[in-house]
């Protein structure tokens, strides 16, 4: 656990780097600590990296692969992403891999949200796609690993439907875009949507 969440992980990483031992540290790590540890690594001819971990989890990998395929066949319409404070860096990594990049982006805080709402809400665009990002901006310093409502929930909306990562260790859910043909006397909720034919 890093200094940012009350642990000694950053200190331990520094000692290892001073001995010339390569270090991969899981986020969250404070950016000042990252800069400091990169300098120590360079001075001792070794490597220091921060790992976002979650893009390597099976369900998250599935979401990333399916997002890449989906975006080759349809146009993105929105992103709705939610995470805990500890999982923000990995969420940026997940989004970057799902969208084949994160730049350019512009997000601003929405100040009109109910003050009791446990999430900080940001609105803007990621890669030109309208986006809402909600971050549970709460951390219990005595128990930083608990009290989070979720790790990640990401919905990628497209012209064909929405792909949802329910949680980092949850399900990947496909919801096809509803299409109602205008044929008199015929009620067909799906029409010719090719995504409805995909195996589940």
Feature annotation, model-predicted:
Residues 1-4, 22-29, 51-61, 180-191, ...:
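Phosphate-binding glycine-rich loops and adjacent basic patches that engage nucleotide phosphates
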């Amino acid at each position: 656990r890093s200094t940012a969440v009350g642990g000694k992980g950053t200190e331990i990483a520094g000692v290892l780097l001073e001995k010339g031992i390569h270090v991969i540290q899981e986020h969250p790590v404070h950016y000042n600590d990252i800069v400091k540890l990169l300098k120590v690594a360079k001075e001792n001819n070794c490597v220091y990296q921060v790992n976002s971990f979650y893009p390597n989890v099976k369900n998250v990998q599935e979401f990333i692969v399916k997002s890449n395929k989906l975006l080759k066949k349809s146009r993105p319409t929105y992103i709705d992403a939610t995470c805990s404070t500890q999982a923000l860096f990995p969420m940026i990594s997940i989004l970057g891999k799902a969208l084949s990049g994160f730049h350019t982006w512009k997000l601003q805080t929405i100040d009109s949200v109910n003050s009791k709402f446990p999430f900080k809400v940001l609105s803007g665009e990621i890669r030109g796609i309208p986006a809402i990002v909600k971050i549970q901006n709460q951390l219990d310093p005595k128990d930083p690993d608990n009290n989070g409502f979720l790790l990640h929930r990401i919905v990628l909306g497209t012209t064909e439907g929405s792909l949802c990562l329910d949680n980092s260790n949850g399900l990947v859910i496909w919801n096809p875009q509803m299409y109602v043909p205008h044929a008199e006397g015929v009620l067909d909720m799906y029409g010719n949507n090719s995504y409805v034919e995909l195996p589940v």
